[in-house]
C-alpha cells in the first residue's frame, strides 16, 4: 500500500514538473506586448535619418515612422526609448526594451546573441572626409586618425580590413556619429567611418561640406533585433512589415526620407 502511495506521489510530481517546464518554455512575447498595450523600441536618438531629434526635441526618422505604422496596425502604443548604443544588447536582455530598431546592422556576431527580422534596407560602411581634402583612397589615410561610433558596425567593418586598420595612426571612438563629424570639421580627426545612409543624409540636409570616398569598407543590411526567445513577437512584426511593403505604405515612408524607395522587403 505504501509502495502504491509513493508511486502515485512520484507520478504526480513528475506531471507537475513537466507542466511547469512547458509553461516556462512557452513563448508569450507577443501576448505580453498586447497585454501591456505598449511596444518599447530601443534606439540611438542621434542617428539621422533613421532616428533623431528634430529642432523641437521630438524623436523622428525613417525607422520611427515605420515603427509607428507597425504599431498602428498591431493596435498597440509605441514607446520610443533612447538607449546607450554601446550597451544595446544589455538593455534588450534586461527587459527594458522589446527590440533594437534604429539602423541596426545584421552581423554574424549579433545573430549569435539576438533574433533578427529579415533585412529591410541595405547600407555600406564608408569613409567621410572634409570637402577639398586630398584623401581619395584608404592608402591616402596611412598614419592618419580615424573616428567611429563606439559599439557600431563601423568597428566590425574596420576589423574586417586589418591591413587598413593597422596602417592608421589612431582610431578614436565617439558616443555618436554626429560628434565624430564635428571633430572631423574641427580637424581633430582625419576621417570618419560610418553608415553611408546617415552620411549622405547629413551632408544633404545639414549642408555640410564633406565628401564620401568611393571605396567602401563593407556592405551590410539593416534588421530589427529581438531577444532570442521572442520568436512570436519577431514574427508578428515581420508579418506586419511585409504587409506595409505590399500595400505601398513602406514606399511612401521611404520616399519621404530618401526621395525614393530604398527598402528591400519583397525585393527579388
Model-derived regions, located:
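Ligand-binding cleft/hinge of the Venus flytrap
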Residues: 53, 67-76, 154-173, 203-207
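Flexible hinge/capping segments at coil-to-helix
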Residues: 30-32, 129-146
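Short helices/loops that flank or line small-molecule/ion binding pockets
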Residues: 72-73, 81-82, 86-100, 113-115, ...
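A ligand-binding cleft/hinge motif common to bilobed small-molecule-binding domains
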Residues: 104-112, 157-162, 182-186, 190-219
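Extended ligand-binding regions for polar small-molecule ligands
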Residues: 22, 64-73, 139, 144-145, ...
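Ligand-binding clefts/hinges and TM-proximal coupling segments of bilobed small-molecule sensing domains
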Residues: 21-28, 153-172, 211-213, 242-268
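Periplasmic-binding protein-like
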Residues: 45, 122-129, 196, 200-242, ...
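Extracytoplasmic small-molecule ligand-binding "clamshell" domains
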Residues: 25-103, 247
Amino acid at each position: 500500500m505504501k509502495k502504491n502511495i509513493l508511486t502515485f506521489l512520484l507520478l504526480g510530481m513528475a506531471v507537475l514538473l513537466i507542466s511547469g517546464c512547458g509553461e516556462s518554455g512557452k513563448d508569450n512575447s507577443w501576448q505580453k506586448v498586447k497585454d501591456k498595450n505598449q511596444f518599447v523600441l530601443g534606439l540611438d536618438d542621434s542617428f539621422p535619418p533613421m532616428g533623431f531629434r528634430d529642432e523641437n526635441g521630438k524623436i523622428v526618422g525613417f525607422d520611427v515612422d515605420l515603427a509607428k505604422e507597425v504599431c498602428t496596425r498591431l493596435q498597440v502604443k509605441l514607446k520610443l526609448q533612447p538607449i546607450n548604443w554601446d550597451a544595446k544588447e544589455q538593455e534588450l536582455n534586461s527587459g527594458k526594451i522589446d527590440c533594437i530598431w534604429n539602423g541596426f546592422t545584421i552581423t554574424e556576431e549579433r545573430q549569435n546573441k539576438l533574433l533578427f527580422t529579415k533585412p529591410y534596407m541595405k547600407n555600406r560602411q564608408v569613409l567621410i572626409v572634409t570637402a577639398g581634402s586630398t584623401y581619395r583612397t584608404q592608402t591616402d589615410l596611412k598614419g592618419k586618425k580615424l573616428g567611429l561610433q563606439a559599439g557600431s558596425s563601423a568597428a566590425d567593418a574596420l576589423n574586417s580590413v586589418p591591413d587598413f586598420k593597422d596602417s592608421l595612426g589612431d582610431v578614436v571612438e565617439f558616443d555618436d556619429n554626429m560628434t565624430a563629424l564635428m571633430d572631423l570639421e574641427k580637424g581633430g580627426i582625419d576621417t570618419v567611418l560610418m553608415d553611408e545612409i546617415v552620411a549622405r543624409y547629413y551632408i544633404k540636409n545639414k549642408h555640410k561640406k564633406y565628401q564620401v570616398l568611393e571605396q567602401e569598407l563593407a556592405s551590410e543590411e539593416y534588421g530589427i533585433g529581438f531577444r532570442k526567445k521572442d520568436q512570436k513577437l519577431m514574427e508578428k512584426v515581420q508579418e506586419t512589415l511585409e504587409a506595409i511593403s505590399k500595400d505601398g505604405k513602406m514606399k511612401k515612408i521611404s520616399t519621404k526620407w530618401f526621395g525614393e524607395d530604398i527598402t528591400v522587403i519583397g525585393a527579388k
